[in-house]
Each structure stands twice: as C-alpha cells, then as structure tokens.
C-alpha cells in the first residue's frame, strides 16, 4: 500500500506525495483535483442589524420569522446560471431519471440543505469502513452538489440515483489500488457512469508487465468493457509545470478526460494539457492517440465554480474536478434520453462508450479558429444540448 501524505510534508524515499506534486516517474496516487476556497461566515445580529463576513460574498443572510437563514448570494447564483448557459444545459424535463451515477471521492455530507432531495442509492467507505455517509474533507460533497444539488444550486442531473464510494481520506488523497476497488464496487453496484474527480501521475511505461496491485486504469478499462462510462479529471498541472499529458486514469484511451475553462469559455490555465502525438522522451512514454480518444476529449467549467461545502454553506472551486462532474451530468442526461445506451444484460458495451465519445467530439463548441483536437482545449467546450441533438442522428 502506498503511503499518502498531505501537502507540505517531505516524503521519505518510500512515501508518495500528493498527485499534483508528483513527477512523471512516480507511481499514481490520488488527491482531489480542485482547490476549494472555503467561505468562512460570521453572522452577528445586534439591534436588528445583520453583519455578514464572507470572502467573495458567496453567501447571504435572510431573516425569516426571527430565524437566520443562510443562502448563496445573488452573485453566486448568477455565476451558477452563467456556467449552465456556457455549457448549454437544456433546462427541460431531462434530469437524469433512471440513470445510476457513482462518484469516487472523499465522501458526501448528506445533511447539506441542497442535498436534501438527493437520491442516494448506495455508499461504501474504503477508508474507514463506516456505514453512514460522511465527508471528512469536503471535496466529495462539492462534486456531488454539481451533479445532484436541488436547493439554491441546481445540479446538472439532479434526479440520478447516486452511489458514493469514499476512496480519499481526510487529507484529500488516497491510494491507486483503493480507487480501483472503488471503481469495481461502483460497477458491481449497478453504476452506469463513474465520475472520477481525481487523478495521479502516469507511469513511466504505457503498459504493465503484470503483477502488483490492480490499478485504477485496469478497473476503468474493465468497467468500459461492460459498457460503463468513465469520466475523469484531466488534472491541474497546467502551465510551466505541465508534464505534457493528462492525469491517470484519464489518460486511458476510452476514459473521457475532462479539461477546464473559465466563465468566458477560455482555457483555464491550471488545466493539464494532453499530448496526442506520442513521445519517447521525456518520460513517461506516450503512445500516439487517435480520434475520438485524444486527450483531453472535452473541456467544461473549472474556474471559481459555485459548489457546496460540508459545513452547510457554499464556496468556489477551481479545477478539472468540477469540469468532470459537468460532463458526468451531461452523459446522465444523454442516457436518460437514450436508455438503450445504458449498460445492462442486453444493452451497454464498449462500442456504446466509443459512440458517445464520438458524439461528444461532434457536438462540442470549439474555440475560435480551432480545427480538430487541441492539446489544451480538447475537441472543444461541452455543449449539452448539441450532444443530445447529435445522439438523435
């Protein structure tokens, strides 16, 4: 079992640091793919005057029947709506009904008011073995909210049946083998889509000689063979420290790797780029990829995305974690509209996964002047309405 350390600790030669500090030659290890800025709120009521101290004004206080109620500010709600518009959310009857989505993350705080109507279908704690859902980090709650919130914030597909596998610990990191177990559990529990807002450094070689622990890539590929859709974060090492490829297991060919954009639809600078040309040096080895499997495949909101916090309030999240859940939700809406693509005894298979990836490639909104795949922008920006239309052929 690989040792996991929080940020700032110096690892010994036998220990592995969090994933966004990893060099290409290290083994995969996971941490949350978002930088969540918690909003600390202090409310004081004196002589009928309500004072709110909230970084970024992400929350507001309402006095109702003598009670103090917390809610997102208009600024946060407007930003939420702007991102829905950016990805062309259909805002119609499709809400993910009949679709089972599994989130592998740090857990979920089901007591948040915006998650009161979440349709929890299953929970498994691979870290501490607890039987009741909880989140001792907060990242999982934030990601779940993007998908299934149904309060002040509205999730992309908030009527899906939600499974949650806790594979990340209180420091936000976890072991690749545990993530693999979590993916296997998702599939055995009936998930149609698995959402992985996490990632690790790729291995030195793009293949295995056998032996050792089962990897998250192995689990993802086995799931895809059964027709389960795997969506994973491209990673947050964009810029001068970018290692030239997306994180693992997003780097697996049939996994849908999701990069990030700003509210203006431009490339988010922290989003990992993908190298679709193949290379030998510098390590890791990257083999050439072909359409529709070039990395990342698609980009979605990743900068200051309004999210739920596990203290019952709201915050902003930067990272391809958030972008991943937007694409997960889009696929859930697609499966609701075309249930014949849902994995099952007489339905889903790996060919369906490639078909959906092709529709994604055909329906995205490319950046101005873009022709074909871009290593930072993928095939383009998620366009949910166009994806649904493309599926109707």
Model-derived regions: residue spans:
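N-terminal domain-start motif of subtilase-like serine proteases
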Residues: 29-47, 63-102, 128-134, 271, ...
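Subtilisin-like serine protease catalytic core
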Residues: 89-121, 131-175, 251-254, 264-265, ...
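N-terminal targeting leaders characterized by basic, low-complexity, disordered sequences
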Residues: 1-21
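Structural recognition of the beta-strand scaffold that forms the well-ordered cores
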Residues: 100-103, 161-166, 192-197, 224, ...
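Hydrolase catalytic cores
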Residues: 163, 167-168, 302-373
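Solvent-exposed loop/turn segments at secondary-structure junctions
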Residues: 107-110, 126-127, 153, 168-172, ...
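Extracellular S/T/G-rich loop segment that most often corresponds to the catalytic His/Ser-adjacent loop
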Residues: 100, 105, 247-336
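Substrate-binding/access-modulating region of protease and related hydrolase catalytic domains
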Residues: 2-8, 33-36, 58-60, 167-254, ...
């Amino acid at each position: 079992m690989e040792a996991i350390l929080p940020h700032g600790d110096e690892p010994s030669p036998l220990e592995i640091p969090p994933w966004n500090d990893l060099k290409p030659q290290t083994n995969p290890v996971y941490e949350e793919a978002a930088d969540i800025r918690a909003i600390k709120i202090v409310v004081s009521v004196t002589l009928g005057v309500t004072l709110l101290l909230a970084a970024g004004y992400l929350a507001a206080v309402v006095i109702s029947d003598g009670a103090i109620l917390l809610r997102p500010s208009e600024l946060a709600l407007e930003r939420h709506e702007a991102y829905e518009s950016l990805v062309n959310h259909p805002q119609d009857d499709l809400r993910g009904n009949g679709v089972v989505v599994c989130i592998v993350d740090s857990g979920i705080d089901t007591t948040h008011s915006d998650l009161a109507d979440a349709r929890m279908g299953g929970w498994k704690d691979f870290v501490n073995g607890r039987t009741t859902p909880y989140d001792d980090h907060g990242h999982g709650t934030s990601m779940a909210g993007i998908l299934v919130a149904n309060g002040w914030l509205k999730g992309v597909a908030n009527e899906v049946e939600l499974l949650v596998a806790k594979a990340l610990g209180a420091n936000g990191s976890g072991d690749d083998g545990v993530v693999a177990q979590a993916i296997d559990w998702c599939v055995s529990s009936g998930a149609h889509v698995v959402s992985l807002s996490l990632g690790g450094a790729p291995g030195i070689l793009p293949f295995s000689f056998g032996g050792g622990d089962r990897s998250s890539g192995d689990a993802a590929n086995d799931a895809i063979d059964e027709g389960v859709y795997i969506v994973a974060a491209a990673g947050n090492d964009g810029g001068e420290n970018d290692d030239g490829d997306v994180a693992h297991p997003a780097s697996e060919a049939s996994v849908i790797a999701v990069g990030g954009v700003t509210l203006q639809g431009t490339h988010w600078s922290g989003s990992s780029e993908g190298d679709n040309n193949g290379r030998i040096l510098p390590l890791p080895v990257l083999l050439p990829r072909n359409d529709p499997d070039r990395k990342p495949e698609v980009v979605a909101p990743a900068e200051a995305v309004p999210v739920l916090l596990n203290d019952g309030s709201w915050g902003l999240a930067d990272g391809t974690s958030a972008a991943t859940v937007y694409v997960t939700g889009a696929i859930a809406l697609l499966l609701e509209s075309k249930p014949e693509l849902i994995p099952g005894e007489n339905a889903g298979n790996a060919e369906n996964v490639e078909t959906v990836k092709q529709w994604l490639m055909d329906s995205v909104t490319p950046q101005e002047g873009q022709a074909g795949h871009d290593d930072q922008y993928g095939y383009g920006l998620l366009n949910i309405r166009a994806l649904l239309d493309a599926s109707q052929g």
